[in-house]
Amino acid sequence: MEAGPDGKVYFAVAGGEAVDNGLEAALRTELLAHTGTGWVYVYDPADRSVQRVVGGVAGASGLALSPDGRTLYVSDLGNRCVWSMDADARELTAGGKNCQSAFSGLPGYPCALAMEADGTLYISYRWARSGWLEKNADSTLLRGIALRAGQNLQEKLFGLPSDAPCAEAVSTADGSWKRTFTGGSSCTAVCPVGSKVYFGAADSAQVLSARI
């Protein structure tokens, strides 16, 4: 969820799959099934309307607005990228007209996003890039088998090695990569405050932090 300077509230639906077993299960399902049924919506409190901003996202799991509130960034879990679009746009399709890839080929599956006042975008990673998943991207059979497997087996397909990035800081002004954060923890939330950035670690009550 992200609130703009004009009071509008943007929120994401990760995908069309049921979330009866929780958001994490829904995200794993989207990675394996790659349905591309995620949507981002905007709520306008002025007239209490809800409109669709962009669809076709393979796991819409993070949102961030540029400092001026004009550009919306959306993390796409399944495509390992972050889309950017005009915050006032409506009914877009991920990768289609007026929706471009701001950062692609990411080293992991992006989750939460956070924006600083200077235009630095923080991208957290829920899982590291899965070689097995990428190798079998076109195998409906193998993906289907993995989809029906238990949670423990599915987690082993992804994981997060100790040397894998759990988050990165990038410049939205020139696209340069400013810093990589490692720590062996899968991140579900990221929040820069002052001289530190805080990370919510998956399956943990701890809040991690790093100086910036």
Across the structure, where does each feature detected by a protein language model lie?
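Conserved beta-strand positions in repeat-built beta-propeller and related beta-rich domains
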Residues: 3, 9-21, 56, 72-79, ...
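A short beta-strand motif characteristic of beta-propeller blades
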Residues: 49-54, 98-103, 176-181
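A beta-strand-loop signature enriched in Asp, Gly, Thr, and Trp
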Residues: 85-140
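Short, conserved, GDST-rich strand-edge loop motifs in beta-rich repeat architectures
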Residues: 11-35, 126-161
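Blade-level signature of beta-propeller repeat domains, shared across WD40, Kelch, NHL, RCC1
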Residues: 188-212
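Beta-rich, blade/repeat-based domains predominating
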Residues: 1-9, 17, 34-39, 53-71, ...
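Short loop/turn segments that connect beta-strands within beta-propeller blades
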Residues: 43-48, 86-90, 171-175, 211-212
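A short loop-to-beta-strand structural motif that recurs across blades of beta-propeller domains
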Residues: 38-41, 81-83, 166-168, 206-208
